[in-house]
């Protein structure tokens, strides 16, 4: 056991320095023009790996990178590993509107490792029913299918003030007779000031994608940077109340490689312990419609349920996000 602790300590020290240097470079990229890493609109493949997968993240419009609540967010926010306090298994599902995909399910598992570390695992699947085909002249052709899946594993430190995490992901996508394989990595650091303010930054989907040509243009992985700050307002303490209400306020900036300007994301979570949570978010997006989102969560014993809704006004519908987790 002593040898294991010493090994984990060495890994912690090495990765801590590496992640700090890497994320400082990533933060500098936000202030740059994007000249060296902007692929142009529509220049990425496997875009589902950058959409929200958990009900909580969807309800907050993607904000809250510095305030992950549970391991249920780990497939999109590697810093969720830093919040693993007990073993948890669960799944998330997205019910798309009429113009969306047909099925998205993700399964996750988190496990504390020793006093300061944690492991996470995730598996997700996105599927479509048969899609109407068109030839080069726009005429109807044979229908074709499309699906994608990804598997990942992560490791991180659960420090009280400073935390870090890394994840590795294998992703596969098939559209008609074209397939894409990717080997990707996520990383993040978080710093908590006392118990009321936290800062976080992540880099996601960094890695290798096999050559795949669609309409003559090569597509890259959906590499993205996100940084944010969260403040926690202890309502009960301020007003000397007996109840345990808290308000979490988050503001984030997010940029994916195919964006010519960043997204600004804002989220609010009103929490009564972990028993009852109300969430709302708003995102300012440069190349598509802005929009509000909302959701709710509650827990009973070791069972946690989450729901989120993200409207899509241009399509006249929205996506429903459902999550169920069990702690043991």
Predicted segments, located by residue:
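Subset of outer-membrane beta-barrel
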Residues: 33-328
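Cleavable N-terminal export/targeting peptides
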Residues: 1-44
């Amino acid at each position: 056991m002593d040898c294991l602790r010493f090994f984990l300590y060495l890994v912690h020290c090495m990765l801590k320095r590496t992640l700090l240097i890497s994320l400082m470079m990533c933060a500098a990229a936000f202030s740059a023009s994007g000249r060296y890493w902007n692929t142009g609109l529509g220049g990425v493949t496997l875009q589902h790996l950058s959409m929200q997968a958990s009900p909580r993240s969807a309800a907050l419009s993607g904000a809250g990178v510095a305030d992950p609540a549970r391991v249920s967010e780990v497939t999109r926010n590697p810093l969720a590993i830093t919040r693993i306090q007990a073993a948890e298994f669960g799944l998330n599902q997205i019910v798309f509107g009429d113009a969306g995909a047909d099925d998205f399910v993700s399964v996750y598992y988190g496990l504390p490792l020793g006093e300061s570390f944690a492991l996470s695992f995730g598996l997700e699947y996105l599927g479509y029913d048969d899609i109407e085909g068109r030839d080069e002249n726009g005429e109807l052709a044979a229908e074709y299918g499309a699906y994608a899946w990804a598997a990942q594993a992560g490791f991180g430190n659960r420090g009280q003030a400073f935390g870090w995490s890394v994840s590795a992901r294998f992703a596969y996508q098939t559209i008609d007779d074209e397939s894409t394989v990717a080997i990707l990595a996520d990383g993040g650091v978080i710093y908590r000031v006392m118990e009321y303010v936290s800062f976080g930054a992540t880099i996601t989907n960094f890695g290798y994608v096999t050559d795949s040509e669609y309409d003559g243009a090569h597509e890259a992985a959906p590499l993205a940077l996100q940084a944010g700050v969260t403040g926690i307002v202890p309502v009960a303490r301020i007003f000397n109340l007996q109840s345990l209400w808290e308000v979490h306020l988050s503001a984030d900036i997010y940029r994916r490689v195919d964006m010519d300007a960043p997204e600004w994301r804002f989220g609010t979570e009103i929490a009564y312990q972990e028993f009852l949570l109300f969430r709302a978010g708003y995102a300012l997006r440069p190349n598509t419609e802005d929009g509000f989102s909302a959701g709710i969560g509650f827990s009973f014993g070791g069972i946690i349920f989450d729901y989120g809704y993200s409207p899509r006004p241009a399509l006249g519908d929205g996506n429903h996000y459902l999550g169920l987790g069990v702690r043991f």
